[in-house]
């Protein structure tokens, strides 16, 4: 995929699989809701989660998004990234509101802000800065494999 196609694909998809390096050498994979901000993938999660502990120890992570059921429909993006863990409460609240706008369409108003503010106290924001991006789109193969 071109850079533009990758950007559109990231906007279309809803869940990213985040792989971090676990404490015993095994990959730790978890699904995350996300938002693309200035070309970086951002997510939030509980501050005490295993993925945060893993990223505290080793900031490298791999993100993968994919779609398609039949071989000729498969599309995806894999992003090798460095993660920054943001712990600033106001930044987390701001990001949480942005995340809710994406995933809870129509959720606005003071009750949403109160809910986000409450959740933000237990969360961190994760910013994934791409080092390398790989993508595939089997629809472009035209049935020739």
Q: What function would you assign to each model-found segment?
A:
Residues 1-15, 145:
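Extreme N-terminal tail/first-helix region
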Residues 4-6, 48, 64, 125:
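Catalytic cores of transferase enzymes with a strong primary signal for eukaryotic protein kinases
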Residues 12-13, 57-58, 122:
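Structured helix-beta-strand junction loops
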Residues 14-47, 55, 62-66:
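Short beta-strand segments
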Residues 71-145:
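Charged, gly/pro-rich active-site loop segments
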